[in-house]
Regions:
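Ligand-binding cleft/hinge of the Venus flytrap
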Residues: 14-21, 44, 89, 106-119
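Secondary-structure junction motif
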Residues: 80-82, 95-116, 183-187, 191
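Hydrophobic hinge/microswitch elements
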Residues: 32-37, 41-44, 51, 110-162
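Flexible hinge/capping segments at coil-to-helix
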Residues: 59-96, 100
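Short beta-strand->loop
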Residues: 1-3, 61-71, 95-101, 156-169
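Central regulatory/effector-binding core of bacterial HTH transcription factors
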Residues: 1-56, 126
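A late-sequence structural motif
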Residues: 9, 162-200
Length: 200
């Protein structure tokens, strides 16, 4: 599971699953989307829950389970930008916080910047989205992060949403199965729950 998928979708579902099947033990591993999918393909996991974008692979059956929206976020020291529509070219003037270069999120935003004739140049690269939250909250830079990950900080005002002129495409949390691999009964029940076909 990727960290964003865990926090924005899976934890709540796992809680329901655990209530329904208290005797079933689950082993969760976390990583980037490419690493998580590589583990699935290698047969190390039964199932992957990741965020888009993902590379197409005929081995995989992909089910979109939830939409999530990234926002440009900054600490309260960027509150003067709140309510304005800032062009992406202006965003480049501020220190930028990003996930590491080996992530699909980095690739997504590198492409997003390039499509607007700009080059993505992060000042701080982090391994996980979870680490981005305190770095942004402390005012060390601005960065694109799923709204759901910073919901509490947005409500309390320690992080502000900075609107940009360019449209940020919505992303999805996906459940990915290996078409070749038979699933255990527990995995089949979990998949049904994730797809919303089993009562929570």
């Amino acid at each position: 599971v990727t960290e964003t998928a865990l926090h924005c979708f899976l934890l709540e579902k796992l809680s329901s699953f655990h209530r329904q099947y208290p005797g079933v033990r689950l082993k969760l591993t976390s990583g980037t989307t490419p690493n998580t999918l590589a583990d699935l393909k290698a047969g190390k996991t039964d199932l992957a829950v990741v965020t888009t974008p993902i590379r197409e692979d005929s081995h995989f059956r992909v089910t979109l389970v939830k939409e999530c929206q990234d926002i440009l976020a900054g600490g309260s020291n960027y509150s003067y930008l709140k309510g304005k529509k800032v062009p992406l070219s202006e965003v480049q003037q501020y220190p930028f916080v990003s996930l590491a270069e080996n992530t699909m999120t980095y690739a997504l935003y590198k492409e997003f910047y390039a499509s607007h004739g700009l080059i993505l140049k992060p000042d701080i690269e982090l391994a996980t989205a979870d680490l981005m939250v305190p770095v942004i909250r402390q005012g060390l830079g601005v960065g694109f992060i799923p709204r759901e990950l910073v919901k509490k900080e947005l409500e309390e005002g320690s992080i502000v949403e900075i609107e940009i002129e360019e449209k940020i495409e919505g992303r999805h949390i996906c459940m990915v199965e290996d078409r070749q691999k038979p699933l255990s009964v527990a995995a089949r029940h979990l998949i049904r729950l994730l797809k919303g076909k089993e009562p929570a």
